[in-house]
Amino acid sequence: MYSAHTPWYDGQVMDYPRRTIACGELRRCHVGTVVVLNGWVHRKRSHGTVSFFNMRDRSGIVQVIVSQEENASLWSTVNRIRLECCLAVEGVVRERPPSMINRALHTGEVEVHARTLYVLSENAVLPFRVDDVVHAHEDIRLKYRYLDLRSQRMQERIALRSRVALAIRQFLSMKGFIEIETPTFICSTPEGARDFVVPSRVCPGRFYALPQSPQLYKQLLMVAGFDRYFQLARCYRDEDARGDRQPEFTQIDLEMSFVSRDDVMRVNEDMLRYVFRTSIGVELPTFFPRLTYAQALDQYGTDKPDMRFKPVLQNADFMGMLGTFTPFEEVVAQGGSIRALVLPGKARCYSRRQIEALESIARAHEAHHLFWLKATGGGLEGGIARFFAGVESEVRRRLSAQDEDLLLFVADCRHRVCCVALGAVRSALIRDESFPEKELFSFVWIVDFPLFEWNPAENKWDPAHHMFSAPQEQYLETLEQDPGSVKGDLYDLVLNGYELASGSIRIHDTQLQKRIFKIVGLDPEEAGEKFGFLTEAFKYGAPPHGGIAHGLDRLVMLMTGSESIRDVIAFPKNTLAASPLDNCPSVLDKRQLDELHLTVHV
């Protein structure tokens, strides 16, 4: 406690008054009461003989006042306190004068007039201001993550993550799901991304892998008869980091027996509606739209479409038979595709240089050019307009183009390249443009994926999702004859252009699983070594089953409007998969390496 004879902070304080109320809970009904607050100095200022500071804890902020006239010693002490110093304050709650009410704070109608104050912990010079962390370099924020986490925006994000996790558990428990933990140390398998591996001390030369997902174990739980399983599973993938990826992440993992694709999708829609309603008060639609993989590619140029941005790719093959533009004519003559993207009201918004920047995006996706037109004055101008003289009205009619619209085109003999390149331009425009629907949550299911995709580098078929997904029934007889035409019983859930969840109906038959192994080039010996325990389990009355996994980090990122999943994880890794906070990963000393029978060559 500070008085005229109390020294400045002198080591750890054990005996201090514990809080009687949280900072953010004070209201007018508390006026006249004596309270004790515990928290941090958020901001401070002085007006002559009166000093003010905002005191903060997880619940919010309240203003504290110390007057030199009332307590000269305490006033002197407050002027020496640094921001983010940890305090205990005892004082009287008083009503603010009407002219001093702060409507930006929930506590803005009151203030606490301090009588005593304890410094519980001093604060060093701050590497950045906690209330202004957006201007700090990310690695500095990660190095001092405990300070970054004090900011209101990070406190709100981490608290929302907790509410989301709680809502998930509540909903799934109500629906009869059982939360079961699966192993963290598993065998390495030859699919997916690179594994993180852990050497075994007791079995020299052998290694555990950290799970990329609980896939095989949740299928075994279905064989075991648990029927409905879920887990907020910690997963690990050794892949290059980017904004929406981390080497360690959390999955909302579900598996169900005796279900169809529609059953799984319905449960997940209901779960998300419950989560959004209870955690952020948002009502989602009663039905999520669906697109086939082919439709998504044709209309959006991607299997992860952002449905908030209304313009879609349009079929413009007719332009190869109108006008005199040779590149379009040649593409159509060779059976290729022309796709158009009409941007309403953007004719005057993009300079030639900006359009060239968009063209570089299309070229990065194998397109040769990005062609353009502007609809003005009832006709067309700029770009390739001169090649369509006399047919401007027909072009505009077929593409529903209005005056002041910007029209972008990609033409290519390869239909997929045509769509993907223009889809990439569309995605870039979404990132750069401000549009009215940006704050919405727009879900879409993508279904009917190819079961396999061709890997030209290794000259073999790869599973499009993973090798435990079932083909659709009509392809069972012809799997080996034409793998490229086989559609899987697969489904992805996309939110605002991000893959939020991925799932499938699983294989539950030993012979079908072996056929899939063979198609993807897994020889019987390796398949038996890596997955024999699964195919063996299928011999003992395995039920039909299916499931899905959501990215919890990505879900919370999108719910909070964050730029990266690093902003919704308490202690994330940076883009190099390292932690500036504790210098992880670290070097092992020789004794540890010897115990593990390892030699490091760097």
UniProtKB/Swiss-Prot annotation:
Residues that, per the record, bind L-aspartate: E191, R237, H465, R506
InterPro entries per record: Aa-tRNA-synt_II, aa-tRNA-synth_II, aa-tRNA-synth_II/BPL/LPL, Asp-tRNA-ligase_1, Asp-tRNA-ligase_1_N, Asp/Asn-tRNA-synth_IIb, AspRS_core, GAD-like_sf
Class of the enzyme per the UniProt entry, highest EC level: ligase
An individual GO BP term: aspartyl-tRNA aminoacylation
Primary site of residence: cytoplasm
Region described as Aspartate: 215-218
Enzyme Commission number: 6.1.1.23
Residues engaged in binding ATP: R237, D238, E239, Q246, E499, G551, L552, D553, R554
Coiled-coil ranges per UniProt: none
Keyword Protein biosynthesis appears in the UniProt entry: yes
Important for tRNA non-discrimination (site feature) positions: H47
SUPFAM superfamilies in the record: Class II aaRS and biotin synthetases (SSF55681), GAD domain-like (SSF55261), Nucleic acid-binding proteins (SSF50249)
GO cellular component, one term: cytoplasm
Localization terms from the record: Cytoplasm
Quaternary structure note: Homodimer.
Protein purpose: Aspartyl-tRNA synthetase with relaxed tRNA specificity since it is able to aspartylate not only its cognate tRNA(Asp) but also tRNA(Asn). Reaction proceeds in two steps: L-aspartate is first activated by ATP to form Asp-AMP and then transferred to the acceptor end of tRNA(Asp/Asn).
Family: Belongs to the class-II aminoacyl-tRNA synthetase family. Type 1 subfamily.
PANTHER family noted in UniProt: ASPARTATE--TRNA LIGASE, MITOCHONDRIAL (PTHR22594:SF5), ASPARTYL/LYSYL-TRNA SYNTHETASE (PTHR22594)
Name assigned to this protein: Aspartate--tRNA(Asp/Asn) ligase
